[in-house]
UniProtKB/Swiss-Prot annotation:
Organism for this UniProt entry: Yarrowia lipolytica (strain CLIB 122 / E 150)
CDD domains hit by this protein: HTH_XRE
A GO CC annotation given for this chain: nucleus
Residue stretches spanning the membrane: none
Primary gene name: MBF1
Protein family: Belongs to the MBF1 family.
Name assigned to this protein: Putative multi-protein-binding factor 1
Gene Ontology biological process terms in this record: GCN2-mediated signaling; maintenance of translational fidelity; rescue of stalled ribosome
């Protein structure tokens, strides 16, 4: 009974000194992971799957087709008609490749690749070119003038 009078009851942040056991911590660097391996702690590496600002790829069907086939499939390229339409529209506006690139906020090499048919089609770049040049570059009717802007 004298033990009850001499023992201390600790309340607060230090109540679990020694008896709490190891806590689960997240190692953010490779050095922390290596230190945990050396000390013999239980180690689990998990990958975060959900992300707030991640985008899924738009090439899903194409990649599946590539996986299922044995031969080598080249990535899609811009059609020659699109390149010719860009050259024609650019010359009508009196723009150089560099000036067009500045207007669409891209590098001159990108414009050159589209005109020569080497580029992979990017919808954002094509839409910027359509707006600056005033001609259609996607779908059917490539090279025809864009219609008037819609009313809101």
């Amino acid at each position: 009974m004298s033990d009850d009078w001499e023992s201390k009851t600790v309340i607060g942040s230090r109540a679990r000194v020694g008896g709490g056991g190891p806590r689960a911590t997240v190692a953010k660097t490779q050095a922390e992971i290596n230190a945990a391996m050396r000390s013999g702690n239980v180690l689990s590496t998990d990958k975060k799957y959900a992300s707030a600002n991640s985008k899924d790829g738009g090439d899903g069907q194409r990649l599946t087709k590539i996986d299922r086939s044995d031969d080598i499939i080249a990535p899609p390229k811009v059609e020659a008609s699109v390149g010719k339409a860009i050259i024609k529209g650019r010359s009508e506006k009196g723009l150089t490749q560099k000036e067009l690139a500045v207007k669409i906020n891209e590098k001159p090499q990108v414009v050159n690749d589209y005109e020569s048919g080497r580029a992979q089609p990017n919808q954002q770049v094509l839409s910027k070119m359509e707006r600056v040049l005033g001609i259609k570059l996607r779908g059917k009717d490539i090279g025809l003038p864009l219609g008037p802007k819609g009313k809101k």
